[in-house]
């Protein structure tokens, strides 16, 4: 899958001034972004996150998920460390796209959980693919990550690509009454490591 570097620029944020790197996946036409801070090509494990696009959570302040809070917390953590990388991947709705995510939300409004809704629409519970991360990390010279995630699939995906995950850093944030059952489903059916707070609240896979 050819993923090519396009351009880089400075991106000032409330947390730090990052370098924004743009990449194009020529096979899909998707445009991905990496935000980096500090020297990330020194061979030492880099604090990082793979963050899949979530328009509703990242930009529209939705409380149906924890995505926006995780994005902000990850950027804040990288800023505190003075060094890190965030890969912003254009995989809206766990890979099903924005309009299908809205369709899934409609089913959830009727009582389905996040996994059941995807499956009723004919999709897998999680359709994301992380293969594009390898050429992006290689371009940046990153060989080892301290990965901010609760998702064991991300750890496995990177490990399978021979990217060392030196440490998994939990990212527990953004919990609220509107997403409690959603998080319980992610813990119970998708294996997300959310501690004891949501374990046992949703049916197991």
Swiss-Prot record:
Q: Which cofactor does it need?
A: Zn(2+)
Q: According to the lineage, what is the superkingdom?
A: Bacteria
- Which pathway is this protein engaged in? Cofactor biosynthesis; riboflavin biosynthesis; 5-amino-6-(D-ribitylamino)uracil from GTP: step 1/4
Reactions listed under catalytic activity: GTP + 4 H2O = 2,5-diamino-6-hydroxy-4-(5-phosphoribosylamino)-pyrimidine + formate + 2 phosphate + 3 H(+)
A biological process term (GO) from this entry: riboflavin biosynthetic process
Its keywords, alphabetically, are: GTP-binding, Hydrolase, Metal-binding, Nucleotide-binding, Riboflavin biosynthesis, Zinc
Organism in which the protein naturally occurs: Pseudomonas putida (strain GB-1)
Q: Which Pfam families match?
A: GTP_cyclohydro2
Cofactor binding description: Binds 1 zinc ion per subunit.
Presence of the UniProt keyword Nucleotide-binding in the record? yes
GO CC, alphabetical = cytosol
| Top-rank EC class of the record's enzyme | hydrolase
Q: What is its EC number?
A: 3.5.4.25
Task: Spell out the catalytic residues.
Answer: 126 (proton acceptor), 128 (nucleophile)
A GO molecular-function descriptor: GTP binding
What is the name attached to this protein's record?
Answer: GTP cyclohydrolase-2
